[in-house]
A protein has these predicted regions:
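Phosphate-coordination loops involved in phosphoryl transfer and adenosine-cofactor binding
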Residues: 1-3, 76, 139-141, 196, ...
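Rossmann-like nucleotide/phosphate-binding core characteristic of flavoprotein oxidoreductases
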Residues: 1-7, 22-25, 210, 214-215, ...
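Nucleotide donor/acceptor-binding cores
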Residues: 2, 25-26, 101-102, 125, ...
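Beta1-alpha1 glycine-rich phosphate/pyrophosphate-binding loop at the start
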Residues: 2-69, 151-178
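Residue-level detector of alpha-helix initiation sites
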Residues: 10-11, 109-111, 150-151, 275
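A Rossmann-like FAD-binding core segment of flavoenzymes
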Residues: 66-92, 97-100, 161-258, 297-301
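Glycine/small-residue-rich loop that forms an oxyanion/phosphate-binding "nest" at active or ligand-binding sites
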Residues: 75-137
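FAD-site-proximal beta/loop scaffold in flavoenzymes
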Residues: 110, 115, 121-137, 232-280, ...
């Protein structure tokens, strides 16, 4: 029996584990990906006290800090469900079950799919969701980034180190990047923005090579590319808790209060899976610490 089981090993989960360890709680972290989505980030430049650090390096530091405490255990396991058992919780993974007095859900988010013809067919064969992971395959190639968020802008900027030409295709008037990233995009001689345009299909033979657009660009509704990176946001991984009765908002995010508490006693949540206003690693880390302390207070009340 663990005092706290933490589902997820990103900044929220690892920060929760670190603080739970400081509080001498018997802690289990269950994660399918140590470090979470920050491991796909090239440079993190908004972590206080560190001007710039690679996502993988920060993830490693967070993990090592958590494991400094002997009460913390990290297991590589995919969680498939969480259920109540009397006053405790049972966490089911693909390889076994674990029981804990409290749970911190920090499972983060999954990539959002476009849901258009060809996307699934060419996944991994010209269709990608992580520039840092797969961009090096496109040295001196022409690629497209679909999306208009700050994340899409950063994906395009990462890809400039390999690709010779990058199209950012966005369905609205102007991409919504942070000013510092928008400035870099607009100054790049490799990046071209196609606004007010949707991609309706991805075509190819053995590999994706053509995007079908809903309006003409340079006289054609077909855009030839060597690959495409889709960055249209992420969806929370809350399917895990459908049996617990945790309240979600209209976006499927876990509703928490300032203490990272949910409506279910003993069940806490932190990070991008919650309804927090600002989805950033540093915010997730803060929520993780809050959730761990709230779990401690809950356990003290007995």
């Amino acid at each position: 029996m663990y005092d706290v089981a933490i589902v997820g090993g990103g900044p929220a989960g690892l920060s929760a584990a670190m603080y739970a360890g400081r509080l001498k709680l018997k802690t289990l972290v269950l994660t399918k990906e140590r470090g979470g989505t920050i491991t796909t980030t090239n440079d993190i430049a908004n972590w206080p006290g560190i001007k710039k650090i690679e996502g993988m390096a920060l993830a490693k530091q967070l993990e090592e800090h958590a494991l400094d405490y002997s009460d913390v255990e990290i297991k590589d396991a995919m969680v498939v469900g969480v259920k109540k058992k009397d006053d405790n919780f049972v966490i089911t993974t693909q390889s076994g079950e674990y029981e804990a007095k409290t749970v911190v859900l920090a499972a983060g988010t999954e990539v959002r799919k476009l849901g258009i013809p060809g996307e699934q067919e060419f996944s991994g064969k010209g269709v990608h969701y992580c520039a840092l992971c797969d961009g090096f395959f496109y040295k001196d190639k022409t690629i497209a980034v679909i999306g208009g968020s700050d994340s899409a802008a950063k994906e395009a900027l990462v890809l400039t180190q390999w690709a010779k030409k990058i199209y950012i295709i966005y369905r609205k008037e102007k991409i919504r990047a942070e000013p510092v990233n928008l400035d870099k995009v607009e100054k790049s001689d490799k990046i071209e923005i196609i606004n007010n345009t949707n991609v309706t299909e991805i075509k190819g033979k053995e590999h994706a090579d053509t995007l079908v657009l809903d309006k003409e660009y340079n006289g054609s509704k077909e855009l030839k590319v060597d690959g495409v990176f889709i960055e249209i946001g992420r969806v929370p991984g809350t399917v895990l808790v459908k049996d617990v009765g945790v309240k979600l908002n209209e976006k499927g995010e876990v509703i928490i209060n300032r203490k990272s508490e949910t409506n279910v006693p003993g069940f806490f949540a932190a990070g991008d899976i919650t309804d927090c206003f600002f989805k950033q690693a540093i915010v997730a880390s803060s929520e993780g610490v809050t959730a761990a302390y709230s779990a401690y207070v809950y356990l003290q009340k007995g």
